Amino acid sequence: EMEKNLIIRFLTTEAIKTPNRPKHKDRLWAAIRKAHRDVMIGARSGNISKYAEKNKDGKDETLEYLYQEILNAKERLSSGFLIQKLQKNDGTLEFAAIQKLVNMTLKYLIILNECEGTASVFDICEEKCDCPVDSTILEKLGRINGNPHKCWTNMDESDYIDVQNEIQTYLKKEYPQGTHGNIWFDFLMWKVD
């Protein structure tokens, strides 16, 4: 068994790096920046150009808003809660980008909670956290249930809800005792297959 501390150190310092000259010197900002980089992988498709425009060259409009919302949240963090906040703040942003930013941020915060578990514990309702939808998840889900899916960067809210429902169906079938949120599917699918 590999030493757990080594794995934890890798996850928390390399995978979720604190950026150079960050606007905010805390782990929340590091998690949001990492999630943003994940979203921007999809920017090459040209389908999330409004999001890309508002968050390029250090503008970070959406990231900054998400940061403040999480810091000032009066309720437990969940996908629906944060997605709704971002949609209300800027209705022009592509839903695909919003869901990925929110869900990847929550995923990284869950990892930080588990691995660092110190003063920076975030109050997350994991049962209400959705799986971040991207090409990897859609490919694995398609292999499981045979359903074709459009490119994640083209997804609107109703496509997203359909995908989350498919994930929930799978989790209930495979893990009937589980009370996990859909984000668990993301962690399950990253195991080597």
Positions of PLM-derived features:
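C-terminal accessory module of base-excision DNA glycosylases/AP lyases that mediates lesion recognition
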Residues: 1-28, 86, 90-193
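Phosphate/adenylate-binding glycine loop and adjacent helical scaffold
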Residues: 1-92
